[in-house]
Amino acid sequence: MFINGDYRGCYLLIESVKRNKDCRINVDKTSGYIVERDPYWWKENRFFTTNYFASSKGYRWTWKYPDEDDVLLEQEDYITQFINDTEQSILNGTYSNYIDIKSFAKWILAHDILGSKDSGGTNLYVAKYDDTPNSLLEMPVLWDFDSNFRMEPGEFSKCHNNAGDFYFYNLFNNTNNSFTSKYKELWLQIKPTLLSTITQYILSITDSEYGRALESSRMLHYNRWGYTPYETIGELAQEAINWFNNHLDKLDVNINKLADNTSISAIKTKEKYDVYNLLGNKVYKPKKGIYIKNKRKIIYH
């Protein structure tokens, strides 16, 4: 951007997260909700908390829709209670009644593919179409891409495994396998063409007018603030392609290791085994119950 001939930097203009009847956040105008899980809640005039995040991290929820000035007390009470019920359902395995599993699975799969090392703080949005029992809690949009490619190749994103960041750790480690199964299903659908699609998209940017403009802006940027020029746009694009080449095959191995328990048979036994519970934790003094042995469900009594 130039102002009166003076270069001021390179900016990306994008639409903010808001209700829009023509896009993925098409919540009902009178009874819909869009809220942000927000570590900077204290900057807002209105916010609310739920049980899962009322801990040391102190995350709160802030309003995207309705606007905070228009929120009625009964609306705040409703969405607070619904999210509290959702959080409890994730812990007890009944989450299928509360969340849109596909949208949650797509959200975390995208960040796993991108190797995001953040994505668990601010800019994390959920929506509910209306205040009826028929609508579920959704994750309609991805956000926060400044930490992509920072995980080691093959590693899941930070938000995947960190129980304090969001709900995903508990969704993957759950007696209800619906979430893990959907996640793996989505991965299998895109895996065959994913690398070629990403590669073609990256190369299309470097060869475009947009890419050439970025290259020019890069040099202007470094000249303005005295930085030493780093790689060209083409070199950065090749680095990204190389990273995906290294990352996706290893990620596939780790995804295949996720337990969805879809083909487990049950047997009864009184024999002594090293056993694991359904969350994959080794049990040193087994009690009566259901355990896993060599991918088989064992009823221990």
State where each predicted segment sits:
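Residue-level detector of functionally pivotal "anchor" positions at catalytic/ligand-binding pockets or at interdomain
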Residues: V253-L279
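Middle-to-C-terminal accessory/interaction subdomains
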Residues: K64-G121, A127-Y129, N134-N261
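Residue-level signal for well-ordered, solvent-exposed loop/turn and beta-edge residues enriched
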Residues: D6, N134-S135, N281, R296
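Internal "kinase-insert"/substrate-recognition segments embedded within catalytic cores
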Residues: I3-L109, K117, T206
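C-terminal tail/sorting-segment detector
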Residues: I290-H301
